[in-house]
């Protein structure tokens, strides 16, 4: 018969083995759940994206500004499909003195004539001249046009404004894909371009988006591991909220068949373990706050389960709508400084 000390020792070891077994089973269950949802999400989006080929970049012109320069350029997304963009490079940044980079996904706002030029500080609301603000903080910034906006409107000029956007959404849908699938492809090519730039630190890439740009942020996050830090401002509409409030929203939010398997916060949760921050306005009708709060809790849980609770943060500003407020911007700056600088 074992003595008391031996009994305690053997019991402790057995308990440890049991705990490890339970933990291991829990980790496997979580991994399996995420793998299954990721697979379903990929299928609902439209399947795998084509491998990125030669970007075939072209530079149109360069203009010196106060503390940074603007470079108008384009690069290939797919054969016969190019993306116009503007690159902002801070003074003093070069191939010999590299810097972190941030891609900015512009907003929708029913302003199809505005894409890259708003964050680049050339038009639109000064509140959203975020590319300029980030360049002055020392980041290389890429501002591309999303499909259906600015220079990527109907090339035949037959359909205008929302009609062309609706046409493109339906065209991708009947092909077994969706607008989100195309947006993700285009954003991944934007990251291809950023990491190709000699003045960019390829391991220090972030992205930021307001409104539709926020949707683009949590859409691309699960599929682009080169993005180290992601910020979404004012857009986390859940399907539950959309249905409850009969909310008409940007086409990228609508992924055919996905609601049978999960909701938008579940998509954002797949970004873990990489860093994610979300800003929300309490009175923003585009992200009904009841479900948005639940969504933020769900994402936080996903990060905690992945063992990286510290890599997700959120800020809900009281009595604030669909804006980029000073407090929200403080969170954006501090987040990128923490994770990219």
Residue ranges, per PLM feature:
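C-terminal segment of N-terminal export signals and the immediately downstream linker at the start
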Residues: 1, 21-39
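N-terminal export signals
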Residues: 6-27
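N-terminal cap/lid segment of alpha/beta-hydrolase-fold proteins
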Residues: 54-94
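Short beta-strand element of the alpha/beta-hydrolase
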Residues: 97-107
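Cap/lid segment of the alpha/beta-hydrolase catalytic domain
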Residues: 105-185, 242-244
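Mobile cap/lid helix-loop segments that gate and shape the active-site cleft of serine hydrolases
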Residues: 173-174, 189, 228-268, 273, ...
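Alpha/beta-hydrolase fold nucleophile elbow
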Residues: 200-209
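C-terminal catalytic histidine-bearing segment of alpha/beta-hydrolase fold enzymes
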Residues: 297-298, 303-341
């Amino acid at each position: 018969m074992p003595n008391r000390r031996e009994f305690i020792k053997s019991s402790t070891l057995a308990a440890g083995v049991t705990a490890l077994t339970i933990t291991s089973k829990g980790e496997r269950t979580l991994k399996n759940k995420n793998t299954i949802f990721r697979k379903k999400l990929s299928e609902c989006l439209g399947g795998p994206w084509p491998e990125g080929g030669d970007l075939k970049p072209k530079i149109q012109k360069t203009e010196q500004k106060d503390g940074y320069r603007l470079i108008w350029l384009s690069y290939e997304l797919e054969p016969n499909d190019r993306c116009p963009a503007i690159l902002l490079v801070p003074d003093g940044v070069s191939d010999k003195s590299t810097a972190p980079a941030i891609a900015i996904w512009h907003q929708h706002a029913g302003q199809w004539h505005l894409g890259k030029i708003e964050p680049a500080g050339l038009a639109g609301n000064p509140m959203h001249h975020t590319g300029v603000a980030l360049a002055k903080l020392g980041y290389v910034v890429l501002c591309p046009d999303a499909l259906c906006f600015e220079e990527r409107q109907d090339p035949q000029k037959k359909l205008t404004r929302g009609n062309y956007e609706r046409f493109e959404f339906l065209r991708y849908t009947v092909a077994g894909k969706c607008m989100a699938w195309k947006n993700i492809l285009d954003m991944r090519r934007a990251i291809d371009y950023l990491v190709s730039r000699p003045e960019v630190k390829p391991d220090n890439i972030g992205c930021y988006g307001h409104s539709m740009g926020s949707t683009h942020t949590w859409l691309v996050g699960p599929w682009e591991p080169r993005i180290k830090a992601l910020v979404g401002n004012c857009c986390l509409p859940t399907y539950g909220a959309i249905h409850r409030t009969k909310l008409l929203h940007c086409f990228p939010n609508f992924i055919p068949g996905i609601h049978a398997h999960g909701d938008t916060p579940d998509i954002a949760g797949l970004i873990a373990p990489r860093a994610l921050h979300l800003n929300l306005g309490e009175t923003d009708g585009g992200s009904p706050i009841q479900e948005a709060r639940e969504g933020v809790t769900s994402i936080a849980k996903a990060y905690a389960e992945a063992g990286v609770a510290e890599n997700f943060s959120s800020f809900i500003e009281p009595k604030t709508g669909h804006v980029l407020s000073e407090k929200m911007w403080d969170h954006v700056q501090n987040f990128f400084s923490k994770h990219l600088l």
